[in-house]
Amino acid sequence: MSLISAVEDRDIHNIGKTSGGGSRTSSINSSKKSLKHGSKSLRKPKVYQTTGEPLSREALYKAKLKYGVYQSPAQSYSIGVSDAHAASDKAANLAHDNQTTVEAYKRMFIDPNATKAASKMGPKVVRNNSITSATSKTSKESQTKRKSKESPGAAASKAYSMTMETTSLSSQTNSRSYSITSASSVLSGASGSFNSTVNPKPKTLNLEKVLVGAEKKAESRIKERWEPEKTNFQYGVKTDEHGNLNQFSFSNEMMNNIMAKVDAPKAQDLQKVKKVSAEKEAKSMKFALGAANAVKDMHPGEDIDKSIALKAQKRETYLSQLTSQQVLTLARANVDRQLDIIEKSDMHRKLFTNMEYNKAAVAVAQSNHQKKTEFHNKINMGGGLFLSPEDITKIASGLISPVLGEVSERAEAQRAMDEEIAERTEAYNKSLNEWETMERSIISNDAKVLTTTANRHQTEKKTSQEKIKASFDALVARMDTKVAERETLLEDTKSKEIEFKKQMQQELKDEKARLDQDLEEWGKKCEQDITEARKEQEELLKPYHDDLANAEAEHKTLVEERDEINAEISRLQDAIVDHKRKISGYGNDLDAQKNRNIREDDKLLELGQTKESLESHLNDDVIILANKAKEQAELSTKEARLKQLEVDSLINERKSELNATEIELKKEKLNLLEAMKDVASARGDDKIDEEKVKKLIGMTSEEYLTQNKSVEKNVEDLPTQLEKIEEGDELKKEEIVGAETKNSGGDGVPVSTAAKEATETSSAVQTKEPEEKISIGNKSSGKEDANDCKSAEHSKEISVSQKAGNNKSLGVSPDSLEHTFSGFSQGSSIEDDQDAISNQEKK
């Protein structure tokens, strides 16, 4: 059994949908007709015919209509709500925006039964159309046009089929251009129609003012109902349904269109077309008049015929009297006034003043509304069965949707496959045809190209040969003339060349004699300048040579001192090894003495020896400890001395390297000065450029010579200062040695205290790190031997001699050597020497 009843083709547009025009009548009548057809058995749509060919589009469309594809609940609109899924929201919005009392008046359609009832109840009016023949003709034409253009959207105007049609006539007369004959006819027709009766029933009372006020009041009430005041609150989801309902308003223009049985846009279009046609006609007449005036005299030089001129003047005066503007305005005002009177006389025939018509329309609307409420939001399924959209969707999704989906999928797949096969075959055939045509065109083009190229080559060959021959002849003639000109020019140049050679030989002889004389004078002058420059060079380089000799001597002394220090280091290392060996022997003796003391203690306890024998044994132990402490002190002093000598050797190596670099620098300086002198002598200058010397050396040559003289004086005074320092050191050493001999001589000091002091000094020496002057501190403690004093004196003499040797040529104040080449290194070494001398004097 099919759940969707079959529908005839003529009733398809009336089921489940509203009409496309302004009237939205219900589809109950059409659905009742469809109920007569019984339910038919469901048949699957055949996509292909028995012969295997696919169905046409029309057959597929009818099959889908038959099986309800286009009338499915998901696609069709219900009677009550357009979208069944959003029925609750739309119902809430409609209830809020449009009240039920207003909804009846807001309907943009009227039931045909209501219009028929209103038309029957209204009185029929007999119109006297005796204005003019032209107006009656236009009224008939307008009636026929309106009947042909009448649409379902203008159903409300059927009730006024017998009303007057002067509104359209007034619009036509206003838009058209007036002429003399039309004005006269209008005046005559209007004078005759003033006495005619408009209505069959005579009016006893003048209710014009009452009717006008009632009409205004009714319009204001209807406007309040049509466009109620909106509140500030909302319910539910807002939609645009209310906007679609209020897209029309019953204004005066709309009412005039309803009375004319024409829709608003169509009436506007008609008016626009009439205006455009009138403008075109006026323009054409204007252009024709201008053309006639322009062509009336083809020969402007000839005189105009007097009879023609008089006729034209009479015609102009006559037309000016007949078609004056005042006459036309008066005629137009009279016509407009009469038309307004005619329109106002039919007030009882208007829509809102006809109470009987409104009552009949409301009664029909209420009856239709009661019929609709029974099956509200339900769909007629046939056989008196009405189902809601939800039930239909459930049934369709459970039974019909899968089958239809599978059928449609297979049909679409097969159709797509057939289309693809057809496209492929068509494309293949097309490409094959194109390829064949291309091959044929290539063969024909090749044959044509060969013939054309051969002919073209022959013609080009002939033309090129002719051109080459002509150009060759012209070139030969041109070259012959040039050769003749060049030969004459060559003879002239040869004669000029002989004269020029003679002149140049004489000039060369004179120039050679002059240059020989200048060369002799210049050679004598250069020899004199060279001798003077050499003398100046020797004077300038003398201090540099002296500095170089002093630096080389200083380098030799430093090398000798380094060798002596290395020999002293090797000797001290041997002594340290010897002392370590002795210390190990003393340690063994101490261990043996401890064992002996233990044995002696046992013997004293056993035998009870005397006090003297015990003291003698104790004194031996103390002596051994003192000797051990002494050896340790000697070892520490010699290690300190070794480190001091290593430091001195490193210092000497650095100084020797510094002196070597200074020597190289001085040599380079001398080479630079010699080069500068050579350059100056080559240029012929008497002196060296002092500015360049100042940039390189830091001072001029004269300042450098005076400074080197002061340095030499300070170097001469340096040995006397060193001798005084050495004498003071020797006196201090003698005092230290005398004090040590007194302490070692035993001036009432016990041996045990000396041993303790020796151990304390040795431990202090071992804990402290050796510095550069640790030997002097150990000497001042008064706990060292005479040999150590001698070695210290020897080392001090070596250091003093080293410093004296290093500073033989540079032992001056740092201010005097501030601007020399090696001023930084020399000044730093001099400051170190002065610090060492001051420390020794303080001690």
UniProtKB/Swiss-Prot annotation:
UniProt biased composition (Basic and acidic residues): 781-797
Stretches with biased composition (Low complexity): 752-764
Superkingdom, natural source: Eukaryota
GO biological-process terms attached to the record: eisosome assembly
Keyword Flavoprotein: no
Region (Disordered) location: 1-54, 120-176, 717-843
Subcellular location: Cytoplasmic granule; Cell membrane
Gene Ontology cellular-component terms listed: plasma membrane
The entry's keywords: Acetylation, Cell membrane, Membrane, Phosphoprotein
Residue positions where N-acetylserine is found in the record: 2
Biased composition, class Basic residues, residue ranges: 33-46
Protein name stated in the entry: Eisosome protein 1
Residue positions, PTM Phosphoserine: 2, 88, 130, 182, 401, 584, 710, 763, 775, 816, 828-829, 838
Species this chain originates from: Saccharomyces cerevisiae (strain JAY291) (Baker's yeast)
Keyword Transmembrane among UniProt keywords: no
Similarity section: Belongs to the EIS1 family.
Pfam families tied to this protein: Eisosome1 (PF12757)
Topology with respect to the bilayer: Peripheral membrane protein
Source organism phylogeny: Eukaryota, Fungi, Dikarya, Ascomycota, Saccharomycotina
